[in-house]
């Protein structure tokens, strides 16, 4: 591939290099795909159909790039260890994945986790979602924030920052709260344990947010080594959200323990109208006000088109 074909003239006016699918796929080089169809199935989101071709075209080159960055980071740590006479702890490499509701962040995170964990260089890769750092339902209700759930104000950001600081300082057995999508709440006294991984993937809506609280001197992004933003046009995102909502009405919402069980008896038209209103009043608003403005802060942007296929990749120079 000729360099002139890869780097467009317009790239000189932006901080990003832009690649189409074919150009990006060529950067996989000879890296083999070890993932099988059977391995892929449990990694997919509720409303996603993603092929092994998508994994090899988009995610394998990305995993290859990230491994280069990790190797460089390890070299820097070796220099620091030598300078400090061996007194610095192991520092995990933190990757963040941001983007809108329904864009497929969780699927991207799980696929990347699988690829990085099965790389020729054996590495321990943990995955944590920021959902666990939402305020409990009771607190959101008291603060009248239920309609702002998913907005930056609905997260216990200081708790998340303390969690990341502990991870970066090399602490053992750091606890992360667990969120239940069934009950729409934090599960009391249950935690994921993160014990000094080589790589931590942090997935969530607002992980690139720099916050509105001017007294905060530290942000989630301060602890992140490589940031990814999964992007798509809003009309596409809304369509995916409505389709997912319809499927939930016929599955998860029918569970008597579901917080949203009152949606289970909606007709299809009622469900479409309800999902559309939720998008317009909550998710779409959060996208415009808080999520989309952080996109250009990412190290890499995956721009999706129809069927969750990535059409463009933008890599920060």
Swiss-Prot record:
Pathway: Cofactor biosynthesis; coenzyme A biosynthesis; CoA from (R)-pantothenate: step 1/5. HAMAP family: Pantothen_kinase_1. It comes from Histophilus somni (strain 2336) (Haemophilus somnus). This is Pantothenate kinase. GO terms for molecular function: ATP binding; pantothenate kinase activity. One of its GO terms (cellular component) is cytoplasm. One of its GO terms (biological process) is coenzyme A biosynthetic process. SUPFAM superfamilies: P-loop containing nucleoside triphosphate hydrolases. Belongs to the prokaryotic pantothenate kinase family. ATP binds at residues 99-106. It catalyses: (R)-pantothenate + ATP = (R)-4'-phosphopantothenate + ADP + H(+). Pfam families: PRK (PF00485). Its EC number is 2.7.1.33.
């Amino acid at each position: 591939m000729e360099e002139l074909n890869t780097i467009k003239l317009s790239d000189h006016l932006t901080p990003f290099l832009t690649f189409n699918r074919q150009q990006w796929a060529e950067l996989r080089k000879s890296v083999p795909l070890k993932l099988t169809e059977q391995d892929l199935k449990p990694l997919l989101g509720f409303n996603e159909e993603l092929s092994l071709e998508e994994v090899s075209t988009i995610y394998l080159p990305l995993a290859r790039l990230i491994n280069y960055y990790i190797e460089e980071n390890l070299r820097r740590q070796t220099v620091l260890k030598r300078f400090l006479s061996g007194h610095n702890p192991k520092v995990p490499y933190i990757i963040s994945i941001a983007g809108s509701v329904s864009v497929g962040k969780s699927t991207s995170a799980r696929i990347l986790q699988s690829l990085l964990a099965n790389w020729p260089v054996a590495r321990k890769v943990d995955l944590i979602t920021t959902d666990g750092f939402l305020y409990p339902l009771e607190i959101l209700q008291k603060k009248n924030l239920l309609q702002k759930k998913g907005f930056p104000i609905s997260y216990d950001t200081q708790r998340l920052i303390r969690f990341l600081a502990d991870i970066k300082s090399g602490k053992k057995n750091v606890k992360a709260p667990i969120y239940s999508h069934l009950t729409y709440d934090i599960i009391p006294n249950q935690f994921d344990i993160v014990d000094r991984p080589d790589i931590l993937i942090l997935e969530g809506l607002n992980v690139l947010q720099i916050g509105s609280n001017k007294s905060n001197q530290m942000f989630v992004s301060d602890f992140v080594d490589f940031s990814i933003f999964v992007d798509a046009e809003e009309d596409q995102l809304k369509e995916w959200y409505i389709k997912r909502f319809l499927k939930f009405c016929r599955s998860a919402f029918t569970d008597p323990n579901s917080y949203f069980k009152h949606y289970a008896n909606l007709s299809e038209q009622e469900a479409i109208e309800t999902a559309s209103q939720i998008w317009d009043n909550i998710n779409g608003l959060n996208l415009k006000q808080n999520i989309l403005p952080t996109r250009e802060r990412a190290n890499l942007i995956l721009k999706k088109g129809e069927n969750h296929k990535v059409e463009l990749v933008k890599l920060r120079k």
